Swiss-Prot record:
Sorted UniProt keywords: Amidation, Neuropeptide, Secreted
This protein's record includes keyword Zinc: no
Positions bearing Methionine amide: M10
InterPro entries per the UniProt record, alphabetical: Tachy_Neuro_lke_CS
Presence of keyword Secreted: yes
Top-rank lineage group of the source organism: Eukaryota
Signal peptide boundaries: none
GO biological process: neuropeptide signaling pathway
Function noted in UniProt: Tachykinins are active peptides which excite neurons, evoke behavioral responses, are potent vasodilators and secretagogues, and contract (directly or indirectly) many smooth muscles.
Protein name, as recorded: Ranatachykinin-C
Length: 10
């Protein structure tokens, strides 16, 4: 995932 994508998971 992209660095920004992990924020979406949270």
């Amino acid at each position: 995932h992209n660095p920004a994508s992990f924020i979406g998971l949270m």
